[in-house]
């Protein structure tokens, strides 16, 4: 029984507060041109809106009295959704790309890894540089740390070290993130 009540409460909260759903004793009304009309009872404000063929939409319930606007709700909803889509387009979800190598890497192979990392960083992704060891190679972890420091120095113009080179089991890992452009 209680669960059913909670769900119905949630549904009513999700619905937009327009026209008859506005349950405040007094509301501040703004017309479709942005001019303040004054403080009205919701019923009077709804009548004012219906005369113009528009809706009364609650814009801000935080202020005292709550602010309502007279506008076309369909158009308002469309513009809100359009803004949300635009904001989502501009948003870039950065992911972590990994560049793996061994501590005994040749110069050309190293340059290829640097180019890969720079492409990832320029596209806004973070780069996890990993150097793996096999067998007794783990004794040379200082060489791997030096190699990762060299990599960070080579990418200093486009990247900043987020996590310094550190041992993680049979690997040495460093995390680079793209530099923020101001």
Curated annotation (Swiss-Prot):
The keyword Chloroplast is assigned to this record: yes
Annotated compartments: Plastid, Chloroplast
Keyword Signal: no
Name of a matching Pfam family: IF3_N
Transmembrane stretches, start-end: none
The organism's place on the tree of life at top rank: Eukaryota
Gene Ontology MF terms: ribosome binding; translation initiation factor activity
GO CC annotation: chloroplast; cytosol; membrane
GO BP annotations, alphabetical order: ribosome disassembly
Keyword annotations from UniProtKB, A to Z: Chloroplast, Initiation factor, Plastid, Protein biosynthesis
Record-linked InterPro entries: T_IF-3_C_sf (IPR036788), T_IF-3_N_sf (IPR036787), Translation_initiation_fac3_CS (IPR019813), Translation_initiation_fac_3 (IPR001288), Translation_initiation_fac_3_C (IPR019815), Translation_initiation_fac_3_N (IPR019814)
Chief place where the protein resides: plastid
Family: Belongs to the IF-3 family.
Biological role: IF-3 binds to the 30S ribosomal subunit and shifts the equilibrium between 70S ribosomes and their 50S and 30S subunits in favor of the free subunits, thus enhancing the availability of 30S subunits on which protein synthesis initiation begins.
Complex and partners: Monomer.
Name recorded for this polypeptide: Translation initiation factor IF-3, chloroplastic
Organism, scientific name: Porphyra purpurea
